[in-house]
Amino acid sequence: MSATQNYGTGRRKTATARVFLRPGTGKISINNRGLDQFFGRETARMVVRQPLELTETVEKFDIFVTVVGGGVSGQAGAIRHGITRALIEYDETLRSSLRKAGYVTRDAREVERKKVGLRKARKRPQYSKR
């Protein structure tokens, strides 16, 4: 492994992303596929690029990502979190601007479990008075 790469782990919902930043031209590879090929949804692509656009490092790094678990939104959020952590490892001065944008904090919201006697986590069966 080269010493010129930075690593960050990102998590969101049940998705986990391992992100490697290497000096390059701005190519983003997710599970050996391009960003546009991996995410069909434009909002997901936008979420992934957010920390790079904020720190103006879009064409400074090649990014290699391995992501597992979750759905489209969770994976995009996990990749964003991982890129943020890798950028902080690369340059600690970026932390304040990334924190202000809210990218450093791990979004801890998880799916609430279904309870016995209820239809879903909180949805109750219809109440009948008589």
Curated annotation (Swiss-Prot):
<keyword id="KW-0687">Ribonucleoprotein</keyword>
<dbReference type="Pfam" id="PF00380">
    <property type="entry name" value="Ribosomal_S9"/>
</dbReference>
<dbReference type="GO" id="GO:0003735">
    <property type="term" value="F:structural constituent of ribosome"/>
</dbReference>
<dbReference type="InterPro" id="IPR023035">
    <property type="entry name" value="Ribosomal_uS9_bac/plastid"/>
</dbReference>
<dbReference type="GO" id="GO:0003723">
    <property type="term" value="F:RNA binding"/>
</dbReference>
<dbReference type="GO" id="GO:0006412">
    <property type="term" value="P:translation"/>
</dbReference>
<dbReference type="InterPro" id="IPR020568">
    <property type="entry name" value="Ribosomal_Su5_D2-typ_SF"/>
</dbReference>
<dbReference type="InterPro" id="IPR020574">
    <property type="entry name" value="Ribosomal_uS9_CS"/>
</dbReference>
<dbReference type="InterPro" id="IPR000754">
    <property type="entry name" value="Ribosomal_uS9"/>
</dbReference>
<keyword id="KW-0689">Ribosomal protein</keyword>
<dbReference type="InterPro" id="IPR014721">
    <property type="entry name" value="Ribsml_uS5_D2-typ_fold_subgr"/>
</dbReference>
<dbReference type="GO" id="GO:0022627">
    <property type="term" value="C:cytosolic small ribosomal subunit"/>
</dbReference>
<comment type="similarity">
    <text>Belongs to the universal ribosomal protein uS9 family.</text>
</comment>
<protein>
    <recommendedName>
        <fullName>Small ribosomal subunit protein uS9</fullName>
    </recommendedName>
</protein>
